[in-house]
């Protein structure tokens, strides 16, 4: 309500000032919106123009890039090729080009090739291979075509560049002006609507001023609602504009991608069509040249210089000039009147081309053909290449299509093509190219009648079109990108596919025309991409980014508008709705808070009083009773904590800490905590951490300790007399590659499927841990891991009774045990493993196990931890640094017949900076050379490897070599359990300097080594402990609790450290005691108290301190009046049984400095207060 009153007062006092400044304030966003819109439009326009210019430049250089990429030829090399020809050759080629018509490319190419002398061709040859297998003459045939092509790109670049600039500039200017006009209209509309809203608001203000004061709250709500409405309208328009811009960007970019794809397809298709057409025409020129050769040397000379053998040999040796042809043949023109004479000269009859069943001649034996029927003219084949030698004597005029082809060829004087037909053997479609061979006396400008009369024969060449196209296109770099089809389109009603397949995206294709030199036949090349258009991520990504930014900015502005426009009534409604939605959760939280407080508060009194009772003068029996009661109370507290943890996990309220901690220190604590129970049963407890595990990791140390404690506690509980419990920690990456494992312990554990006696810590068989690792996804996952995180694999192995097979499926179910007798025999509630598994899952890990009844169980889990910074240090371990410095560089010898146990001992020594060698027996130690035994600081012998007779030999060796040794090593015996009497007896023999009781841990080793090696030097930790005991001496501490027992427990614990304790029973009394000035140095505050709880009392105390500090700072009062303190802040720590995280957060929010949960120990109380005082 106070917030509402302040808002109403501010509105009534500044209504006129606000209304007068609204107009000026409004003009600023409108102007800013117009300016931003204009800048965005201009920026987008220039970006697009720049990209268009780059695209124009890239497209202009496209042909040059394609030529270089596919033929490895640059523009300068083409110019060099042209410059190789002499001026006369170039002039001749240009004249040929000028005289020829557009359809006569082949003819003038041949003429140019013939005009170049053979000797010049040899001297001007260029090793420039286009991948087509042509000779130098074929290169010269194309010389007349290169220069016109090279003269065009520069002009085309300039024209295309100017045209692209003009079109792009006009298009984007037009779009920009339209957007700007639209933005101005929208801004004007907003301004008009706001003017109306402002007028209405002024009228409402005048009416509200006349109303009674009781309606001020309603007026403030209405004004605020109206003031926020127009802001939401502008925000909505802005979001719509951003969405529209995102959609437009996607559409424009996608269209551009499609256009580029089409242009790429067109360029690639045109390039292939041009290559195919050019090479076909080059081959056509060679066939034409062959026809001229036949005319010159067969008909022009008497006798003829060519026969079948010569023709066959010549065509075979010059076949490299016609790599695209399947074969060539020459047919002689024979009139009917000369048929008999012709047949007598050649010794064979002219055969008919087609048989009665219309089978193609290539598929039949010529001897089986019928004689050619009587007709005016015949065209029998007299010369043929070896590949088509079977058609000799066949009349080419007897075939309908070949007859038409021959007639067109001799009438036009050009090469003509047949329609596609299937070739022999290959079953491919092919065509036949026919040239008429004329008499050498035929003039160049002969008429059609003259050409028919001068015809003396016909030269034909067959082409296998699929092989031809495949041969020409296989050298192109992007051959696999597009699919190419070649069609004969002479008959538009029925296209004939000469080459191609059905693969590819037929929805988008490009058609390029082909000119094979026959104007009466039409051919086309159809190209398409083999794959469909991929997802346009280039268009989607920026569009989504713009959309996300739009919504993010819109959300931020919307939240800001809501914060401005929200009134207390709306907040209250939201709180009510939220309270209804979370009613069940609040009830559960209240239940947990009440139960934990009601149970833990009396437990605090029970444990506190028992502890105080044990500090009194009790006899042995009374002390035993008090210790038993205290232990049972702690067990009950642990049970309560487990139940509360399970409830918090189920409700999803459990959160993990993220602080640096030393995992080895945690494992030492757990082994120290549980070593007593393990030693009572004679169980060997061992801990090993891989050297690859960092010294400090980031995570939740308390929850990690809880998991280890649960697993090890269960192992101790279910392990009978003797045996072992082995805790090992490795990086999960170490087990990914079993063949590359370097860690000695891990390698031995993976060596056998089920560990043998000699391969375990105690010698008792244990199940192999591999069974619990192999199903972990996190261990063998191939996903990349963050560089600042590590995955740890923790294994707890025991030699207990094992888990029955039928009970293994429900082992992680809460409140479930193997059978009903388990709880009666071993105790427990069955929720420890369930809690541990859920905690592991919160650590992004997995938990599993493998167990065999009668052998034991192995539990393993993984967890993700953070890597600590290199300079991170743990305060708890700093007290060991000095001791480690004393031991660094020492050498030790470990004698143990168990390899894994010896590695555990070496691991503990390595933590102290001591290097150790391992031997398996005392006999092997005796056989070691003197150099290995020299400079040893200590020898550690496991009790299982101890043999008095063998050790006497080793002791004698030390005695004889005492001169060579700088010092005699100390002897330590490592035992799982030993009474004080047994330890004294062992040391009295003089062979052993000290007996170390396992489990080995840093603190125990430091203590033993310091007492033995440094001759009883006092340990640094004890000195530090005694110094810390003076921190609370003479300190004034206030304890606030409504429970008398709790006050007495806290008072007794603090008085032991010399503190002066004052107790009060309520928050009001504490408020009076803590009102400055006062003499208290710290305060323990209970949270749940009648009249005034701890939260309210702390808030009141902080308010009083702030007021006093403010007055002292401003000089209103002097510091001498308040005990010369310039700033008052008494440390207040909460005492409560409520352990829910929400309560802890509330304590910090109200101004408390710390948190102590009940029941608490003396150490807990002392540590909580001591951190606020400087050591003396």
UniProtKB/Swiss-Prot annotation:
InterPro entries: 2C_system_His_kinase (IPR050956), CHASE_dom (IPR006189), CHASE_sf (IPR042240), CheY-like_superfamily (IPR011006), HATPase_C_sf (IPR036890), His_kinase_dom (IPR005467), HisK_dim/P_dom (IPR003661), HisK_dim/P_sf (IPR036097). Residues 51-174, 254-536 are extracellular. Its EC number is 2.7.13.3. It is a multi-pass membrane protein. Residues 1-29, 196-232, 558-1176 are cytoplasmic. GO terms for cellular component: endoplasmic reticulum membrane; plasma membrane. The keyword Ligase does not apply. It catalyses: ATP + protein L-histidine = ADP + protein N-phospho-L-histidine. Cytokinins (CK) receptor related to bacterial two-component regulators. Functions as a histidine kinase and transmits the stress signal to a downstream MAPK cascade. This protein undergoes an ATP-dependent autophosphorylation at a conserved histidine residue in the kinase core, and a phosphoryl group is then transferred to a conserved aspartate residue in the receiver domain. In the presence of cytokinin, feeds phosphate to phosphorelay-integrating histidine phosphotransfer protein (HPt) and activates subsequent cascade. Involved in meristems establishment in seedlings. Self-interacts. Interacts with AHK3, AHP1, AHP2, AHP3, AHP5, ATAF2, AT2S3, BETAA-AD, CYP20-2, DRP1A, HIR1, HIR2, PI4KB1, PI4KG5 and At4g12060. This is Histidine kinase 2. It comes from Arabidopsis thaliana (Mouse-ear cress). The gene is AHK2.
């Amino acid at each position: 309500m106070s917030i509402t009153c302040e808002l109403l007062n501010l509105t009534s006092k500044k209504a006129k000032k606000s209304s007068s400044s609204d107009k000026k304030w409004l003009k600023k966003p409108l102007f800013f919106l117009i300016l931003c819109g204009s800048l965005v439009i201009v920026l987008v326009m220039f970006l697009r123009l720049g990209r268009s210019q780059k695209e124009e430049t890239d497209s202009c250089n496209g042909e040059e890039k394609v030529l270089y990429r596919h033929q490895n030829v640059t523009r300068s090399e083409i110019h060099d090729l042209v410059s190789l020809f002499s001026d006369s050759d170039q002039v001749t080629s240009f004249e040929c080009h000028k005289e020829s018509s557009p359809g006569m490319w082949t003819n003038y190419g041949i003429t140019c090739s013939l005009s170049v002398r053979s000797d010049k061709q040899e001297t001007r040859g260029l090793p420039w291979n286009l991948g087509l297998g042509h000779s130098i003459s074929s290169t010269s045939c194309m010389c007349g075509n290169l220069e016109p092509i090279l003269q065009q790109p520069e002009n085309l670049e300039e024209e295309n560049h100017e045209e692209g600039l003009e079109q792009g500039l006009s298009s984007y200017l037009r779009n920009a002006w339209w957007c700007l006009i639209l933005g101005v209209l929208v801004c004007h509309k907003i301004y008009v609507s706001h003017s109306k809203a402002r007028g209405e608001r002024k009228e409402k203000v005048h009416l509200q001023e006349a109303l009674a004061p009781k309606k001020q709250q309603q007026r403030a709500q209405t004004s605020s609602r109206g003031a926020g409405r127009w802001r939401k309208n502008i925000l909505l328009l802005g979001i719509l504009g951003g969405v529209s811009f995102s959609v437009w960007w996607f559409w424009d970019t996608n269209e551009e991608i499609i256009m580029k794809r089409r242009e790429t397809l067109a360029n690639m298709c045109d390039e292939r069509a041009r290559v195919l057409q050019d090479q076909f025409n080059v081959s056509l020129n060679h066939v034409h040249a062959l026809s001229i050769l036949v005319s010159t040397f067969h008909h022009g000379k008497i006798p003829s210089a060519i026969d079948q053998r010569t023709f066959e040999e010549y065509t075979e040796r010059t076949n490299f000039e016609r790599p695209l042809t399947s074969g060539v043949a020459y047919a002689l023109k024979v009139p009917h009147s000369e048929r008999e004479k012709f047949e007598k000269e050649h010794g064979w009859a002219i055969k008919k081309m087609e048989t009665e069943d219309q089978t193609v001649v290539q598929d039949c034996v010529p001897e089986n053909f019928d004689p050619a029927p009587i007709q005016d003219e015949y065209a029998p084949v007299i010369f043929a290449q070896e590949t088509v030698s079977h058609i000799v004597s066949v009349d080419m005029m007897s075939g309908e299509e070949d007859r038409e082809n021959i007639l067109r060829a001799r009438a036009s004087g050009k090469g003509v093509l047949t329609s596609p037909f299937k070739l022999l053997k290959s079953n491919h479609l092919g065509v036949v190219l026919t040239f008429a061979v004329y008499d050498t006396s035929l003039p160049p400008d002969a008429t059609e009648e003259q050409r028919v009369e001068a015809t003396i024969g016909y030269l034909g060449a067959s082409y296998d079109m699929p092989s031809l196209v495949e041969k020409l296109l296989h050298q192109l770099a992007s051959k696999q990108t597009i699919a190419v089809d070649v069609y004969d389109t002479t008959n538009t009603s029925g296209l004939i596919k000469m080459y191609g397949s059905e693969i590819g995206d037929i929805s988008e294709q490009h058609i390029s025309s082909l000119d094979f030199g026959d104007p009466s036949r039409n051919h086309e090349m159809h190209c398409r991409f083999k794959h469909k258009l991929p997802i346009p991520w280039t268009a989607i990504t920026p569009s989504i980014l713009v959309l996300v930014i739009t919504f993010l900015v819109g959300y931020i502005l919307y939240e800001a508008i809501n914060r401005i426009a929200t009134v207390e009534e709306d907040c209250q409604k939201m709180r009510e709705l939220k309270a209804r939605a979370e009613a069940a959760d609040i009830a559960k939280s209240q239940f947990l808070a009440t139960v934990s407080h009601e149970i833990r508060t009396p437990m605090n009194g029970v444990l506190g009083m028992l502890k105080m009772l044990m500090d009194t003068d009790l006899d042995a029996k009374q002390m035993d009773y008090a210790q038993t009661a205290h232990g049972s109370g702690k067990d009950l507290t642990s049970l309560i904590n487990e139940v509360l943890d399970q409830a918090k996990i189920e409700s999803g309220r459990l959160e993990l800490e993220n602080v640096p901690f030393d995992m080895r220190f945690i494992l030492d604590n757990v082994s120290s905590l549980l070593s007593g129970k393990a030693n009572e049963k004679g169980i060997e407890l061992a801990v090993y951490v891989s050297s690859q595990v960092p010294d400090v990791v980031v995570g939740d140390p308390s929850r990690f300790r809880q998991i280890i404690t649960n697993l090890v506690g269960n192992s101790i509980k279910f392990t009978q007399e003797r045996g072992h419990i082995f805790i090992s920690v490795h990086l999960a990456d170490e087990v990914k590659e079993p063949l590359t494992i370097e860690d000695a312990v891990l390698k031995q554990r993976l060596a056998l499927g089920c560990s043998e006696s000699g391969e375990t810590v105690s010698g008792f068989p244990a199940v192999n841990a591999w069974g619990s690792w192999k199903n972990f996804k996190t261990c063998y996952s191939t996903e990349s891991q963050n560089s600042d995180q590590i995955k740890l694999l923790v294994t707890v192995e025991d030699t207990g009774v094992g888990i029955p097979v039928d009970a293994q499926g429900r082992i992680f179910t809460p409140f479930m045990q193997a059978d009903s007798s388990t709880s009666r025999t071993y105790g427990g509630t069955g929720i420890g493993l369930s809690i541990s598994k859920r905690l592991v899952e919160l650590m992004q890990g997995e938990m599993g196990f493998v167990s065999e009844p009668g052998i034991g169980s192995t539990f393993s889990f993984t967890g993700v931890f953070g890597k600590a910074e290199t300079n991170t240090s743990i305060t708890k371990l700093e007290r060991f640094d000095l001791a480690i410095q004393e031991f660094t560089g020492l050498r030790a010898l470990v004698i143990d017949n168990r390899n894994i146990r010896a590695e555990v001992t070496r691991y503990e020594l390595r933590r102290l900076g001591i290097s150790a060698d391992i031997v398996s027996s005392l006999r092997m130690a005796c056989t070691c050379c003197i150099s290995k035994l020299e400079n040893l600081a200590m020898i550690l012998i496991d009790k299982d490897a101890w043999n008095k007779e063998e050790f006497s030999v080793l002791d004698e060796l030390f005695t004889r070599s005492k001169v060579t040794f700088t010092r005699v090593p100390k002897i330590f015996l490592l035992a799982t359990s030993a009474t004080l009497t047994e330890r004294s007896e062992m040391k009295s023999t003089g062979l052993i300097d000290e007996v170390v009781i396992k489990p080995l841990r840093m603190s125990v080793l430091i203590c033993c080594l310091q007492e033995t090696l440094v001759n009883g030097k006092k340990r640094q930790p004890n000195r530090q402990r005694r110094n810390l005991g003076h921190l609370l001496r003479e300190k004034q501490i206030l304890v606030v609790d409504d429970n008398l027992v709790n006050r007495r427990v806290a008072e007794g614990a603090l008085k032991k450290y010399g503190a002066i304790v004052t107790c009060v029973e309520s928050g009001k009394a504490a408020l009076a005691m803590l009102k400055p000035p006062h003499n208290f140095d710290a305060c323990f505050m209970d949270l749940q108290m009648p009249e005034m709880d701890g939260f309210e009392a702390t808030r009141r105390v902080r308010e009083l301190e702030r007021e006093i500090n403010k007055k002292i700072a401003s000089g209103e009062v002097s510091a001498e009046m308040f005990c010369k303190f310039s700033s008052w802040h008494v440390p207040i720590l909460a005492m409560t049984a409520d352990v829910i995280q929400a309560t802890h957060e509330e304590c910090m929010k109200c101004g408390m400095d710390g948190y102590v949960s009940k029941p608490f120990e003396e150490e807990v109380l002392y540590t909580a207060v001591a951190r606020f005082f400087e050591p003396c």
